[in-house]
């Protein structure tokens, strides 16, 4: 369960870099790594769908899995400049929340998460 909580606290999103803001919307998938509160690391795979809410605000829904757990979470992001986005995520199953940043560069993005005593980083590609 500790792995599931860590995934829940970390598996969703990151910071964008060189695509237009409109290019954040859509489906993305990729791999990354989670550092658990115990200090252990696990590889994870995530599928994320971003939707524009208003202007420069987005919502996201992600499903991420490691060899030991699978979790779903939601997020809210705000464009903070260029192709950089920041926001927060929440996993209702484990009641875990945290901060996240996304940087988009063309058809790829880097996502960083911090919450629930764990950190994660993912590289996602547009599907």
Name each model-derived stretch.
Residues 1-6:
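Bacterial N-terminal signal peptides that target proteins for export
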Residues 9-18:
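C-terminal segment of classical bacterial N-terminal signal peptides
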Residues 22-127:
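Central antiparallel beta-sheet cores of small beta-barrel/beta-sandwich binding domains
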